């Protein structure tokens, strides 16, 4: 759906509508909702039941907050329409079920903005939509519905036998089911009941498959849009935590900071060492493993390498005694 911008003197310029986070434009979303509503209504009519839907959104009539917006904003009573400060009118609408807001564009008058809201509401909510101009839209729907009924009556799809031929309806643009299996066999005249039952079964299965496919695609896109901001927030939080940890973590010294060689350098340096400069650790620790003196050994006998005792406590080992020690001045 293209959005038009108009001013008092300039000619209308066609511009592309903005794409949302999921990559779909407003026109694409409205088209999907329109197809979905047409399929639901058609399947409900064939089964003889009313389509089950939620109550459509009322649409805000308050416009902007009090004291905000343009001068005529407080006098506007259209749904989903409000006025900017500079006088332009904007239209917005919320999607069914999820309630996400769709921006419909900027318009020179409130009536055009209200018409854009009605168009979007009709596409999203079908016949249950709450509109600003229900009479004008109702007349348009009656004309299109009469055309679709004529097209449906003239081009009935018949299923019979095992042979199927695909037929596309090109004469009626308002028919939501333009792609219907049209099978025509001469043997259908002999089995009208079986043909009717087969036709109903195929239509119901086709409608169910289309509804299921549409819902899966739509809700998949909605979930992706909702998960994107969460993923972005988680990534931002992780980055902030990493930065905080880096700031709080002290500057730790590594082996390289002390100038110690790496293992590869040690292996390479072993080839340049002199074997005479090396020693065995077992030889160094051998003396520690030798047994000490026996407890029964005389404490008065001292080894030759002992210097712990006073010289007066030493006894001669050759049979001579120390004479005249009293005259020594100690």
From Swiss-Prot:
DNA-binding region: 77-134
This protein's record includes keyword Transcription regulation: yes
Basic residues bias: start-end ranges: 51-65
Biased composition (Polar residues): 1-10, 294-306
Biased composition annotated in UniProt, kind: Basic and acidic residues: 310-321
Keywords: Activator, Coiled coil, DNA-binding, Nucleus, Stress response, Transcription, Transcription regulation
Pfam families the record matches: AP2
Cell location: Nucleus
InterPro entries: AP2/ERF_dom, AP2/ERF_dom_sf, DNA-bd_dom_sf
Inducing or repressing factors: By high-salt and drought stresses.
Motif Nuclear localization signal per UniProt: ranges: 13-54
Tissue note: Expressed preferentially in roots and stems, and at a lower level in leaves.
Biased composition (Low complexity): 237-248
Functional summary from the UniProt entry: Transcriptional activator that binds specifically to the DNA sequence 5'-[AG]CCGAC-3'. Binding to the C-repeat/DRE element mediates high salinity- and dehydration-inducible transcription.
Homology family: Belongs to the AP2/ERF transcription factor family. ERF subfamily.
Protein name as catalogued: Dehydration-responsive element-binding protein 2B
Encoding gene (name): DREB2B
